[in-house]
């Protein structure tokens, strides 16, 4: 793969969960954050609700599963095009799981 070029991806994540006392205690701060990159719409994030996060925001686990799903879809479409297979629609329902021993 001598013709491979390195691609770099940069995002900025800002924690905006200081409720006035910073991280003075486990229950004293919000897990909310914002992700931005190159003028794209911001992603409002938080922790998983089980970890005191805001369920209306994307959590890192959901973003990881979405990222893997998107990569799989893009590769699938590439392989289909290369093989002369015409794809006219695509839907994926990806799922992830994790164990959280001792987190609470």
Question: Where on the chain are the PLM-derived regions?
Answer:
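Extended beta-strand/beta-hairpin segments
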Residues: 1-66, 74-104
